[in-house]
A protein has these predicted regions:
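A short beta-loop-alpha structural element at the N-terminal edge
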Residues: 6-18
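Glycine-rich phosphate/pyrophosphate-binding loop shared by adenosine-nucleotide-utilizing enzymes
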Residues: 3-5, 63-68, 163
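Acetyl-CoA-dependent GNAT
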Residues: 38-93, 105, 110, 114, ...
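Conserved GNAT acetyl-CoA-binding A-motif
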Residues: 111-133
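Conserved GNAT-fold acetyl-CoA-binding loop/helix
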Residues: 19, 23-46
């Protein structure tokens, strides 16, 4: 059961807690294809880079960070501006409690305001059953309304095993002939966050 859940914009002083969460997935799973956990300074720089344009959110339950979610550029070419790649990581003991769903709902609501049209998720998938990866992330994204697009076979090698990569997508805004320009996160932040950078829940986001 979740306690008092709050969604907030990430702060740099949160970075070490987020890095601890990420370290688990680097060292124990194939959910991320990184081999080495980044340094704290590198991790902070990643946060800074993402926040220049996209949302980076943390979930706190009774004041303790339990997970985080963010969007990043799908591709550097200008024509891809309305597409983003999404990433989410939860503390291992905080999965299957609804936190991931609420984080994703908040992220999606913000991306809509930014005029993003496509949310894309790059998800590792096991070639063979094993201890480092399952299909939970795929099922989670299906539950969130994502559809599978394509699979890259045996394209990731980690823990002496090969893993597939599945791309999934969700359309969240109309594709128009005269597309509205993409807005930066800081241009829409005040519409959904209070002065303490806490998400103001609306009726479309339920706990």
């Amino acid at each position: 059961m979740m306690g008092n859940l709050q969604i907030e914009v990430v702060a740099l002083e949160d970075a070490w807690q987020l890095l601890d969460i990420y370290r688990y997935y680097v060292e124990n799973t194939a959910i991320t294809f990184e081999y080495e956990t980044p340094s704290l300074e590198e991790f902070k720089q990643r946060i800074i880079t993402i926040l220049k344009r996209y949302p980076y959110l943390v979930a706190k339950v009774d004041g303790q960070i339990t997970g985080y979610v963010y969007a990043s550029a799908f591709h550097e070419r200008a024509a891809y501006d309305w597409c983003v790649e999404t990433s989410i990581y939860l503390k291992p003991d905080c999965c299957h409690q609804g936190t991931g769903r609420i984080l994703y709902q908040c992220l999606e609501n913000i991306l809509r305001l930014q005029h993003v049209t496509n949310m894309n998720a790059c998800i590792a998938s096991p070639v063979k059953p094993g201890p480092y990866l399952d299909d939970n992330s795929i099922r989670f994204h299906e539950h969130m309304g994502f559809q599978p697009v394509d699979k890259f076979h045996s394209c990731g090698y980690k823990f002496q095993s090969w893993f597939d990569m599945i791309w999934m997508e969700k359309m969240i805004n109309d594709h128009q002939e005269k597309q509205l320009p993409l807005l930066r996160f800081d241009e829409v932040k005040k519409a959904v966050f209070d002065e303490k950078n806490r998400y103001q829940f609306k009726s479309e986001v339920t706990e």
